[in-house]
């Protein structure tokens, strides 16, 4: 009774007001799984293709009717009757139907919508939570949230080069308390920014987006907020960055426009090293550009023993690219984004590779999100230990935190909030 009897896709809006794909999968037993696909702003060049209509007369060319049609007219007829309990088989069928390396024929947004909706339908049919369906009986670790409370780069209309300034409430005794600590710090930061006459408008991921004197000033404001909220920087709450360095990599150099600096790879690593020393940073994501593998190797060798070095654009959740990165000593952690690779199965394969290779995993949202909470369940399902899902504002971000609170409640004494940040 877990066979697919109907598949329906539609065009909806994401958190930026841009179209995205939503898919319903209906099973013979009568249950329905629904999923909405996220979209990124700063994207890796080797991500699976997000199909857009390129029709300037609709949504400024960003419509997704072609992807919707590919679900309804191409994918659906081929998977009617397919058993959703065979997620790997379903995903492989769609990958084979597409026949391209980057899912450019059908669109990763079309394929992923079906993949996620099918997983959710199968969980409903089994009358178990999604995290249990994906992760089995061992799914029990709640993730430490990486909360993006100051936005810059491609995520905000301000002068900060670094894209995300995050807090990690790893000193909390539970996920619920971690969310509380993060919210208190977020609201304290808002009061501080207001007092200083700075903007408290928020960026794509719900963090504040003020114009500041430097990237370092953003860190200093966050430290002040942590302390004024009653917590200890580096003890109760840590700090992490997503540099998104590919966005300011120009002609082989790194250009900090806000500070009038042009840096080599080595000089940029020197800069990060000074930040780690002065501010006790715990994690830096995409510290170098995705094509600067020599710089990545240097940063990993110099800072990898004292810092989580997360690869996002450099790996794009792709098991083949990630495998090469592991062999060449690139980073020690991987960011996991479902829509970078385009199926649930391939995402799980990449996570398994990370675990087997001693890399940490961080489950992540995209800057263009919806109310869908799939990644919250995924983080618990794979015992990732960390999740990146934005700030403590905007319902598209808060929805994931609320789902994690529900999961923690459901797990009860069986749930674990990590004592070691980098599980």
Curated annotation (Swiss-Prot):
Name the coenzymes or cofactors required.
Mg(2+)
The UniProt entry annotates the active site at: 205, 337
Q: Does the keyword Nucleus apply?
A: no
The UniProt note on the cofactor reads as follows: Binds a second Mg(2+) ion via substrate during catalysis.
Q: Which PROSITE patterns match?
A: ENOLASE (PS00164)
Which SUPFAM superfamilies does the record cross-reference, listed alphabetically? Enolase C-terminal domain-like, Enolase N-terminal domain-like
Question: Which residues of this UniProt protein bind (2R)-2-phosphoglycerate?
Answer: 163, 337, 366-367, 388
- Provide a Gene Ontology MF annotation, just one: magnesium ion binding
- Enzyme Commission number(s): 4.2.1.11
**Record bears the keyword Cytoplasm:** yes
Protein origin, superkingdom: Bacteria
Q: Where does Mg(2+) bind?
A: 242, 285, 312
Give me the reactions it catalyses.
Answer: (2R)-2-phosphoglycerate = phosphoenolpyruvate + H2O
Among Pfam families, the record links this protein to: Enolase_C, Enolase_N
* Places the protein is found: Cytoplasm; Secreted; Cell surface
Gene3D superfamilies, from UniProt? Enolase-like C-terminal domain, Enolase-like, N-terminal domain
The UniProt entry's GO CC annotations, sorted and at most eight, read: cell surface; extracellular region; phosphopyruvate hydratase complex
Protein's pathway = Carbohydrate degradation; glycolysis; pyruvate from D-glyceraldehyde 3-phosphate: step 4/5
Protein purpose: Catalyzes the reversible conversion of 2-phosphoglycerate (2-PG) into phosphoenolpyruvate (PEP). It is essential for the degradation of carbohydrates via glycolysis.
HAMAP family for the chain: Enolase
In the record, the note on similarity to other proteins reads: Belongs to the enolase family.
* Protein name as it appears in the record: Enolase
The protein's organism comes out as Desulforapulum autotrophicum (strain ATCC 43914 / DSM 3382 / VKM B-1955 / HRM2) (Desulfobacterium autotrophicum)
Q: What taxonomic ancestry is recorded?
A: Bacteria, Pseudomonadati, Thermodesulfobacteriota, Desulfobacteria, Desulfobacterales
Give the gene name. Answer: eno
């Amino acid at each position: 009774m877990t066979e697919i009897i109907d598949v329906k896709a539609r065009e909806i809006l994401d958190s930026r007001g841009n179209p995205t794909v939503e898919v319903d999968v209906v099973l013979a037993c009568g249950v329905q799984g629904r999923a909405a696909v996220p979209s990124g702003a700063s994207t890796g060049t080797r991500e699976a293709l997000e199909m857009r209509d390129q029709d300037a007369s609709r949504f400024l060319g960003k419509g997704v009717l072609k992807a919707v049609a590919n679900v309804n007219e191409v994918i659906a007829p081929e998977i009617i009757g397919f058993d959703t309990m065979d997620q790997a088989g379903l995903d492989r069928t769609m990958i084979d139907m597409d026949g391209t390396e980057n899912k450019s024929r059908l669109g990763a947004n079309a394929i992923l919508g079906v993949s996620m909706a099918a997983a959710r339908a199968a969980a409903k049919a089994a009358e178990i939570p999604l995290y249990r369906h994906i992760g089995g009986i061992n799914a029990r670790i709640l993730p430490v949230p990486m909360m993006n409370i100051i936005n810059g780069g491609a995520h905000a209309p301000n002068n900060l080069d670094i894209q995300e300034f995050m807090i990690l409430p790893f000193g909390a005794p539970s996920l619920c308390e971690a969310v509380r600590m993060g919210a208190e710090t977020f609201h304290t930061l808002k009061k501080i920014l207001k007092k200083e006459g700075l903007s408290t408008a928020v960026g794509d991921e719900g963090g504040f987006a003020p114009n500041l004197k430097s990237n370092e000033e953003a860190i200093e404001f966050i430290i002040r907020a942590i302390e004024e909220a009653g917590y200890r920087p580096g003890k109760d709450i840590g700090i992490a960055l997503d540099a998104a360095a590919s966005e300011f990599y120009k002609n082989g150099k790194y250009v900090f426009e806000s500070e009038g600096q042009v840096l080599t790879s080595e000089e940029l690593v020197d800069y990060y090293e000074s930040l780690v020393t002065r501010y006790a940073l715990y994690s830096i994501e995409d510290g170098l550009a995705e094509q600067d593998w020599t710089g990545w190797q240097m940063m990993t060798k110099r800072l990898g023993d004292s810092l989580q070095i997360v690869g996002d654009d450099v790996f794009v959740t792709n098991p083949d690219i990630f495998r090469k990165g592991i062999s060449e000593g690139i980073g020690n952690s991987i960011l996991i984004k479902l829509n970078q690779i385009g199926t649930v199965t391939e995402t799980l394969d990449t996570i398994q590779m990370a675990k087997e290779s001693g890399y940490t995993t961080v489950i992540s949202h995209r800057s263009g999100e919806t109310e869908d909470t799939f990644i919250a369940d995924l983080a618990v399902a794979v015992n990732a230990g960390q999740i990146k899902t934005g700030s403590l504002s905007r319902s598209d971000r808060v929805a994931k935190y609320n789902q994690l609170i529900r999961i923690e409640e459901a797990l009860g004494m069986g749930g674990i909030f990590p004592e070691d940040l980098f599980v």
